[in-house]
Each structure stands twice: as C-alpha cells, then as structure tokens.
Amino acid sequence: MVLSPTDKSNVKATWAKIGNHGAEYGAEALERMFMNFPSTKTYFPHFDLGHDSAQVKGHGKKVADALTKAVGHMDNLLDALSDLSDLHAHKLRVDPANFKLLSHCLLVTLALHLPAEFTPSVHASLDKFLASVSTVLTSKYR
C-alpha cells in the first residue's frame, strides 16, 4: 500500500503528538487486544497479562519503538522492519491476522487519547500506515 504525501504528513504529525506516551499507548493497545481477542494471549504464555503488568508495558514499549522506527522510514519499511519480520515469521510464528487486530486496537487507543487530532483523514492515514507495517511484518511468511 502506497502512502501519499498527505498520509505521511498525517502519520508524522500524529506520532509527534504521541511524544513520550508511546510505550504507555502501546501497552494499552496490547491490553485491549488481549481483552477483546483472547486468542492472541497464546503467544504470551510466559507473561503476566494482568492490568498494569510490567511485561505488557515492556512489550508495549517494543511495539511503540518499532512503530517509531517505521514512522522514520516510511519510504523503506521493508528494510527498516526486516529483522522484525524475520522474528515474527520464523521464530515467534505469530498468526499474521494478529497484526490487523493489534492495528485496530492501536487506532482505538490513539482515538481515545488524541480525539482532537483523530480526524477522518488522520484515521485513514494511520490505518493505511499500520496496514503497510503489517504487510511488511508478514512478508517473510511466504
């Protein structure tokens, strides 16, 4: 999926507003995913998945850091996320459908925390961006 200049601008502007809340929002999105899509818990059998879990917060930071990297490399997501794609496809063997679920939960989380910024245009741009990231993360499954 090709991101237009407007999409890229919307994503960068929104990500800048997230500021130092990335880890917090990442953890909140994961917690939301675990509550609403319980099958996703199977990939974290060693985690305490309770509210305010340090392990979920730590993984939320990893998610946020990966997305921050992706925001900085929107023109070359394939190279920027190649290692993560390998990890999820070959070592962790995450069901590719879970990326869409997490993307949805991230969008909900961002809409809740940034209601003024979450216009229909920004929503569409973030959705396209997260779909592009998901496509890259599942590219090594084939």
UniProtKB/Swiss-Prot annotation:
Name assigned to this protein: Hemoglobin subunit alpha
The keyword Transport is assigned to this record: yes
Gene: HBA
Keyword check for DNA damage: no
Phosphoserine: residues bearing it: 4, 103, 125, 132, 139
Tissue: Red blood cells.
PANTHER family assigned to the protein according to its UniProt record, in alphabetical order: HEMOGLOBIN FAMILY MEMBER, HEMOGLOBIN SUBUNIT ALPHA
Source organism per UniProt: Balaenoptera acutorostrata
Similarity comment text for this entry: Belongs to the globin family.
